[in-house]
Amino acid sequence: MRFDPKEIGEILEMLLFRELDIRAVTLSVNTLPAIRHRVSDTISALEELLEPYLKKLRPAVEKVASRLGVRIVTVRLAVSPVSIMLEPIGDAKSTVELAYFLDDLAGKYGVDMVGGFSAFEHAGVSRGDRALMEGLAEALNGTSRLAGFLNVASTMTGINLDAVRKSADIILSLKPHAAARFAVTANLPEDVPFMPGAYHGLGLPDAVINIAVSGPGVVEAVVRNLPEADARTLHDAIKRAAFKITRLGELVGREVSKELGVPFGAVDLSVAPSPKVGDSVAAILEAMGLPRVGSPGSVFALALFVDAVKKGGAMAVSNIGGLSGAFIPVSEDAVMAQAAAEGAVTLDTLKAMAAVCNTGLDMIGIPGDASADVVAAIIADVMALAVYLDKPLGVRLVPVPGGKPGDYYDLGGLYGKVAVMEISRYSKIPLMSRGGTAPPGVERLKKG
């Protein structure tokens, strides 16, 4: 597809006036060759393995950004799941040592975030998984760049309720800034460029570049220019805008890959918001005709938007990766955060919207004194949606000490202001104490 002069002008307007940017360039590196039996040896091997890549990463990204005239917001690193690296070591103290090392190494080379401090526990917990869980809260509370997740459910194996409950305990022991870097997930793909879900998957090459795009302001402007359009016309206009946004991600990915000399992996099609004015997914939904995001019609509007983004983005890239849909992180979207604080958006509304988007319950403030039963039940609800709808979803909750519904907690930067939401009138949910594994659903049988 070629751009005519009018379309070129539109892209320039997107870059200059509509906050179009690349959210993240994520370098994903296989760190399993650095596994050793002592944590000190593992750290030495990791340093030797990662430094040649990291020395070139930020200079390469800045060179491409300058040459193309595109703003690239963050530079990120994803490593192999750290729980695997902990298998021969198996203690929480080593978990924390690895965390501090990775955090310091990232700072040394100008890397904004490191993903992969993670474990896959959807069918059970291994020695390395246990070591990671035991040290995870201290690791995240004591670092600023580290991000991680626990994958506790999958369509193929069901939901590990023991891991769900342990995840709830971890969330409640995290400081707000640390909680913003931790998620509980299901069905997580191997090539996610967004944090905290990024990690180097077992099926990937030794190193690969994955790209995360942004651009809600672009789509909002398109929608506002069509106040009388029918649903089909609106869908087509969003689809065309998504093509242009994602095509930029493809170009940046190819150029950075060439500069670094590593393969280009995929572009995550997801349109990600930020706390800036004019960079909101919720504002798009309201421009489509909702009186307020969270009102009746919100799930339909989001479904229409996500479908258009997927179809437009898929045509623009050589390889689709990550979560590829739309993100509705409450605190990272100024309009969504305000609606949550007002009570227009509730936890149940967000659960319903999770059925048609890709993030689940994301960046939601909860009272710091919330019970572990309630937090575990919230996680279990989203894991059920992921397993029985056969899709990736996650939960990222931010406990706010002393916070009450309607309060804000300012995390700053891309995380924005967390709105504390009403989560439950109940404090005890005995179902969450049953433990065990909920078996996979019928979708598992369809896969053979």
From Swiss-Prot:
- Family per UniProt? Belongs to the UPF0210 family.
Name it.
UPF0210 protein PAE3581
User: Transmembrane segments in this chain: where?
Assistant: none
InterPro entries referenced in this protein's UniProt entry, alphabetically: UPF0210
Q: Which residues form a coiled coil?
A: none
Q: Which organism is it from?
A: Pyrobaculum aerophilum (strain ATCC 51768 / DSM 7523 / JCM 9630 / CIP 104966 / NBRC 100827 / IM2)
SUPFAM superfamilies on file: PFL-like glycyl radical enzymes
Q: Which domain of life is it from?
A: Archaea
